[in-house]
């Protein structure tokens, strides 16, 4: 007798007639007039529960089995047999059922109902992984993360752990969470009456990171190919389906790479991870296609088999101006493309994923390489049908004088970035990278509309529960 995951039973990795033990939670119990009960037991290892067939001859049948309800935890031992019923190949003929934990009051159990609104589930985020939806999201999230690590490992990249606490603003937007141990009731002041951060824990004003990119560049300029993958933070007061205050970012950086290399890497990476999730999470993707977004599987299959289009920002604006469509947000050269513009390009004009590149310098960050025209930078956004921007990246500015000039234009103090500037002083190289918002990737794969539902415990304005 061995303990096995439910997935091994349902996917035929356990021999028929072998005695096994599965451990999990009751999804449903059904009783027949013939004195047999059917328990659907899940353990999270796959989408479907396994059916345990329990005869009333078991010694605890009347006292315990007949009182099991949704959410109770059980340990079921029995023989794996071919299932005569529709919908599953194998089931367990139980010889022993142990109750590990009861649900105190089945009538008030928050997960008792079969269907819950997505808004309600956010209020019980500690219990929502027990639902079909959030359980499937969690498994897909895991598979995507593992596929990303696998892809970069196979490509010769090194994973670098960049700090979560920083004194630098990568984006230059100032939307950062301050980190401080100062006494809010008795703040130290300097001669100008401002808060004296010299007295703070780090001896300077410090923040939660908005990106690992700048730190990542330092390692790319020594190890050649690296990536970072971890949480990032934006103190942006946005209550939308696309924004979180805490989210995960994947950021590769490659030395001796230009913008074209960057675009090729992004395309290869996305196709790799989409192929992985289609192959490894077929049961979960089937659920998303049936219950969440009927195009979920077909969308990824199209993506994997379609070459990316490329277009310069200037040409993209011309396409939008000539298309005859009325947009909510006006289109003109110099505007940052909105989601509706991005989706028109990907879904209606190119009908494919598209890389928009060479944006006006005024709407992009200081570290992006200035093009020869002096007006645009070597930036790129990857736009995907169905969502719009999924990746943002650029070739980085490797020329110290140009970098300093861009910092001055944007009102940044170059002394705050002395270590970043050192990379341009000691053996500078062209290099490129991009950022992928992990939650937006998961939303795209699953068809789940709100990024709050693809991260275990969402952090949003006025919400840091659990």
Curated annotation (Swiss-Prot):
GO terms for cellular component: cytoplasm. It catalyses: tRNA(Asn) + L-asparagine + ATP = L-asparaginyl-tRNA(Asn) + AMP + diphosphate + H(+). The gene is asnS. PROSITE patterns: AA_TRNA_LIGASE_II. Keywords: Aminoacyl-tRNA synthetase, ATP-binding, Cytoplasm, Ligase, Nucleotide-binding, Protein biosynthesis. It is found in: Cytoplasm. Its main location: cytoplasm. GO terms for biological process: asparaginyl-tRNA aminoacylation. Homodimer. This is Asparagine--tRNA ligase. HAMAP family: Asn_tRNA_synth. Signal peptide: none annotated. Belongs to the class-II aminoacyl-tRNA synthetase family. It holds the Pfam family tRNA_anti-codon. One of its GO terms (molecular function) is ATP binding. Its EC number is 6.1.1.22.
